[in-house]
């Protein structure tokens, strides 16, 4: 008898999560549409949505704009302010610790300077600022903490290495969970950006590649609307030059070692014997025909083109999205890299390939991170799921 009751409760929870996650992804949706898309009866949908409304996870938001005769259905929406999230976004210079709602809308943000600090000291600073935010907004109202940065993350949240942070095997998850008592999820920031982009653009594309050129080079595949987690995406640590520049990972000739804004500047300064320039000035001199600028940009662009061609040959995307970021002030490097890519990849794979160049900002990245956190939290296997 107990087993039968348990099975009923499990099925009830599964259906509640199915409805909640459908509404999360389809704001302003009516109960009949939910029933149609989930395959559940309308009476079941009524019971489930009543529970979710009482728990504060859904809210009613007017009636549908339908031309049909008869009573219009009430629309439902995911209530993003039901709980809060803390998201820490790190780079080599600073960390931004934000308190957001469930869709990543910022309610408070602290910037922490971390230049020159050890990993242990950075974690301590994060703990201090997270504690301040929890005191302000309430730990009981906060579902989880997300930590996002350019990094190799395995098994969902196990951090391994970050070339940009110069960290290896730092257990940031364990440290923050022990200090806060909240679940902590560590994620590669490129994935957060890709999640935001795919949820707001090209949602119907079956196969999209998102390549992030900020603080290294990472790739994310979105296949049939979902992140392909079997593709690790560490294109930045694939070898493109046998005896190339040394990389923090311990290898030589990694793509992100051979193509970075820092390397463009270094190549230019080696050619000219100057110091103190920046990539924007090099781009300007490239346009003026400066041989040193053209050499520095073209050399790095060639390696990026090789990396992109390798990706295309392996995954055959319909859309290639390039987050320019570090090279936004040197757009000709991206242009040259795309041309190199097309020269090296099979023409049949690039003939109909659509290439988009974008700039994913801070707020968009946080929204992507929030989507990822909610996907993990509102999951049947999550021990921190608020749905019963």
Predicted features along the sequence, with ranges:
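Gly/Thr-rich phosphate-binding beta-strand-loop-beta motif of the actin/hexokinase/Hsp70
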Residues: 70-108, 209-223
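Glycine/GP-enriched mid-protein hinge/lid loop-to-helix segment characteristic of carbohydrate kinases
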Residues: 109-111, 118, 180-284
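Glycine-rich phosphate-binding loops at beta-strand->alpha-helix junctions
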Residues: 37-41, 317-340
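Glycine-rich phosphate-binding/hydrolytic loop that grips phosphoryl groups
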Residues: 8, 13, 21-24, 185-200, ...
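A mobile "lid/hinge" subdomain adjacent to the ATP/sugar-phosphate binding pocket shared
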Residues: 255-321
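Conserved phosphate-binding catalytic cores of ATP/NTP-utilizing and phosphoryl-transfer enzymes
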Residues: 60-85, 184-208
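Extreme N-terminal segment that seeds HTH/winged-HTH DNA-binding domains in transcriptional regulators
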Residues: 1-31, 36
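Glycine-rich phosphate-binding loop and adjoining helix at the ATP-binding site
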Residues: 106-207, 331-343
